[in-house]
Design a protein with these regions (language model features):
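Phosphate-interaction motifs
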Residues: 1-149
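Solvent-exposed alpha-helices and their adjacent loops that cap or buttress functional pockets
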Residues: 7-11, 29, 83-86, 126-128, ...
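Structural motif
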Residues: 51-54, 81-83, 90-92, 132-133, ...
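Glycine-rich, charged/polar anion/phosphate-binding loops
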Residues: 77-79, 119-122, 156-163, 222
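Short acidic, glycine/serine/threonine-rich loops at helix termini
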Residues: 105-106, 146-149, 187-188, 245-248, ...
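Short N-terminal or domain-adjacent regulatory/targeting segments
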Residues: 143-169
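Glycine-rich phosphate/diphosphate-binding loop of Rossmann-like nucleotide-binding domains
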Residues: 159-214, 218
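Short glycine/threonine-rich loop/turn motifs
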Residues: 180, 207-338
């Protein structure tokens, strides 16, 4: 840092905010810390009484914080991310459209191992709305060495985007509703309306709902019928416990395909099941999905609707943060559930 006359400061980096006060009209920063002094700034600085200022000289091999931020977002940001203009060297990330936020955690940790880098995000694998603040980046010093940025860019080249929003598909969903009491109209189906509302929330559409009773073969055949009709997801509601009449898990297994999990370390929603039949996800939904505001459904189904292929490992990772706190006022996804 050095003190120089404003006439000699062109091309140098301002070390501090410079305040301008116009009584009754304006009080604020005329120039922000990190601003690179231009020829046109000299008269303005003199007008507000600044004949000398503290600056950094931008030496060869160093990059100004604003330019560094632009380079970092170019290297690290994937689809679905809108950027703010740099302010004091920081650029924020906003969601361009509704979708599921994906963060490459290992790469995120690797780039932040350098103490001159700040790249912060909210938790990933959650639904976000258009305009949602997702994170931001900056370098810590006003100027940073070129090799620091080169290392950052190389990490991004090796790992792909650090942050991106994957859009939700305009998915077609088929619902198979189990339970003899519903088939025989002893009670009104309350699961279907809940699932339709959740589908609408995710931009999907329920193209059909069938009622199977508790016959394993009927449940199986109705699942396969929806798949043959070209749905993107089959949701089987109810029949997921160990009661003798609960046949959903056996029916899903009888469809063939790959069972990913029967059981999830999530409360509510531990009796959840996921299988892929002819490449189409089939989920078995426990009764809590109908009764509770947020459940395992909200942690898993949005990811399925982006086309992500889930594994048992994905479910294991839900354990940390898998307990919903049943808050009186639900603010999901802006809470710790699923994080």
């Amino acid at each position: 840092m050095e003190k120089v006359k404003v006439q000699d400061a062109v091309g140098m980096v301002l070390c501090h905010d410079i305040t301008e006060i116009v009584p009754g009209v304006f009080k604020g920063a005329a120039f922000r810390k990190g601003h690179i002094i231009e020829e046109k700034d000299i008269e303005k600085l003199l007008d507000i009484g600044k004949e000398n200022i503290f600056v950094w000289d931008l030496l060869d091999g160093y990059v100004h914080e604003n330019d560094a931020a632009y380079r970092m977002v170019k290297a690290a940001v994937g689809e679905g991310i809108a950027l703010t203009e740099p302010k004091e060297g920081k650029i924020n990330f906003l969601a361009k459209f509704p979708g599921v936020l994906k963060i490459n955690l290992e790469a995120l940790y690797e780039i932040n191992a350098d103490e001159q880098i700040c790249f912060a995000t909210i938790h990933g694998n959650k639904t976000v709305t258009e305009g949602k603040l997702l994170g931001g980046t900056r370098v810590i010093p006003l100027v940073v060495k070129e090799e620091v940025l080169a290392s950052f860019e190389e990490t991004c080249r090796k790992n792909g985007p650090i942050i991106q929003v994957v859009p939700l598909k305009k998915a077609k969903i088929g619902i198979v509703t189990t339970g003899s009491e519903i088939l025989n109209k002893r009670i009104t189906d309350k699961f279907g309306p809940v699932l339709r509302a959740k589908a609408e929330e995710l931009g999907a559409v329920v193209v059909g709902q069938s009622f199977s009773g508790d016959d394993k073969n009927v449940i199986r055949d109705q699942i396969l019928k929806f798949i043959e009709e070209g749905v993107d997801l089959v949701e089987v509601s109810g029949g997921m416990s160990v009661d003798p009449d609960d046949m959903t898990p056996a029916a899903i297994r009888d469809c063939g395909g790959e069972v990913v999990t029967y059981g999830a370390p999530v409360l509510p929603g531990s009796m959840f099941m996921l299988s892929y039949v002819k490449g189409i996800p089939v989920v078995g939904l426990p009764g809590c999905v109908m009764a509770a505001k947020r459940t395992v459904y909200d942690l898993v189904v949005p990811r399925l609707l982006t086309g992500e292929k889930l594994t048992r490992r994905d479910f294991v990772l839900l354990a940390h943060g898998g307990q919903c706190q049943n808050c009186e006022r639900c603010v999901y996804p802006d809470c710790g559930f699923g994080q």
